[in-house]
Regions:
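Mixed-charge, Lys/Arg-enriched low-complexity segments
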Residues: 31-63
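N-terminal acidic leader/helix
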Residues: 1-39
Length: 63
């Protein structure tokens, strides 16, 4: 699962299968902005979950 780019922002997901959680690191112009934490079930988070979290973040922050 690679980085997602939207309007000058980069969203880089990472996750731990053992702990069943992850985070999406948000960057703007290479500078760290914040971290979006999430939980998931299974071997890896579904791509749709990551997309939904990114879309929600963009909507809430008017990106």
């Amino acid at each position: 699962m690679g980085a997602i780019e939207r309007n000058g922002y980069t969203f880089e997901p990472e996750y731990s299968v053992t702990r069943q959680n992850g985070a999406i690191h948000v960057y703007r112009r290479g500078q760290f902005v914040e971290e979006i934490r999430f939980d998931f079930e299974g071997e890896f988070p579904e791509h749709d979950l990551i997309e939904e979290l990114v879309n929600h973040y963009c909507y809430e922050n008017k990106i």
